[in-house]
Regions:
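Intrinsically disordered, low-complexity segments enriched in small/polar residues
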Residues: 2-73, 77-132
Length: 132
C-alpha cells in the first residue's frame, strides 16, 4: 500500500508540474502590446487626469503621450477626467487587443478612441458629465 501511495503521489506531482509549465508556456506565446495614450484635445484645454489600474495618476497636457508595455494578459481598466467630464474604458482587453504590437489611444473632445494602425480610430468611450 505504501509503494502504491508513493507511486500515485509522485505521478500527481509530475502531472501538476507539467500543467504549470504548459500554462506558463501558453501565456508567454501571447503577444502583449505597448499601450500609447495621447492627449489630442487642444493646446488651450486643461490637462487630463488618467488613472490606469495598477499605475499612479497621470496628468496629460496637450500633445503629451504616455506609454507602457502590457505585462499580463488581463483587462486593464482606465478612467480619464477632464474638468467635469469622465470616461471609462479598457486600456487593454485580451479578447480584442492581444496580438497587436501597439494599441494607440487618443483623448479627444468626443471621447476616447482606439487604433491599432495609428490611422483608423474607433470611439471606445464617450465623456460623461455636463453637456459640452
Amino acid at each position: 500500500m505504501t509503494n502504491l501511495s508513493l507511486f500515485a503521489i509522485s505521478h500527481i506531482f509530475a502531472l501538476s508540474f507539467c500543467l504549470v509549465n504548459i500554462t506558463t508556456i501558453a501565456e508567454t506565446d501571447i503577444k502583449l502590446p505597448e499601450i500609447q495614450i495621447h492627449n489630442v484635445l487642444s493646446e488651450s484645454a486643461a490637462p487630463v487626469k488618467v488613472q490606469i489600474t495598477g499605475k499612479p495618476v497621470i496628468l496629460l497636457k496637450y500633445n503629451d503621450l504616455y506609454k507602457w508595455n502590457v505585462t499580463r494578459n488581463e483587462i486593464i481598466y482606465s478612467t480619464a477626467i477632464f474638468g467635469h467630464y469622465s470616461a471609462n474604458w479598457h486600456a487593454f482587453d485580451p479578447s480584442s487587443d492581444a496580438g497587436h504590437a501597439i494599441s494607440f489611444w487618443w483623448i479627444t473632445t468626443d471621447g476616447i478612441f482606439q487604433s491599432f494602425d495609428n490611422n483608423n480610430y474607433e470611439l471606445r468611450a464617450k465623456w460623461v458629465g455636463d453637456e459640452w
